[in-house]
């Protein structure tokens, strides 16, 4: 039911996270001037953490990872490689969650941070929230001269 949305999240977010140089993972657009502004790496960590936590709601089980400091997941993950591995794990876990949504259970209420919601609405939130942060990640990337892979022309079209 939500496989295409999750595949799009995987394609867009993972390719952008891979494209950003490792030395830019600790950079925020205006670091030090806005309290709590996430670095690029923290954006990826937050996105992955929320994928884990939202997928756990869909599955009605305890999330494998808690929110950590500032909803950015495990504090010990710092390198680009560690963060990409965490993101890949989150997407795999979410794939299990969206696979569990069926015609028979998609309207069943599940608890969420916003109160009880249909399982399908919570599953849709995986992509919704992911693309909110993907947009922020695109800004970070472009500020550092990185063209998001999704914006690279695939033939005959002009660059975005």
Residue ranges and their predicted role:
Residues 3, 7, 11-14, 26-71, ...:
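Short, contiguous alpha-helical
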Residues 8, 12-15, 19, 89, ...:
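Solvent-exposed, charged/polar functional surfaces in cytosolic regulatory/catalytic domains
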Residues 18-27, 97-107, 143-148:
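Surface-exposed helix-capping loop/turn segments at secondary-structure junctions
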Residues 20, 47-50, 61, 90, ...:
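Alpha-helix boundary/capping residues
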Residues 74-110, 117-131:
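Acidic/histidine-rich alpha-helical segments that form the ligand environment
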């Amino acid at each position: 039911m939500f496989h295409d949305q999750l595949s799009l999240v995987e394609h867009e977010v993972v390719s952008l996270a891979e494209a950003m140089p490792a030395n830019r993972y600790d950079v925020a657009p205006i670091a030090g001037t806005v309290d709590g502004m996430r670095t690029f790496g923290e954006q990826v960590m937050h996105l992955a953490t929320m994928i884990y936590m939202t997928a756990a709601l869909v599955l009605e089980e305890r999330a494998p990872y808690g929110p950590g400091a500032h909803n950015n997941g495990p504090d010990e993950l710092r390198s680009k490689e560690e963060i990409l591995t965490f993101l890949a794990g989150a997407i795999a876990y979410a794939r299990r969650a969206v696979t569990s949504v069926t015609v028979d259970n998609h309207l069943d209420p599940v608890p969420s941070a916003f109160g009880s919601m249909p399982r399908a609405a919570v599953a849709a939130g995986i992509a919704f929230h992911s693309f909110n942060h993907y947009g922020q990640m695109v800004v970070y990337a472009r500020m550092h001269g990185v063209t998001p892979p999704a914006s690279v022309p695939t033939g005959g079209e002009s660059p975005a």
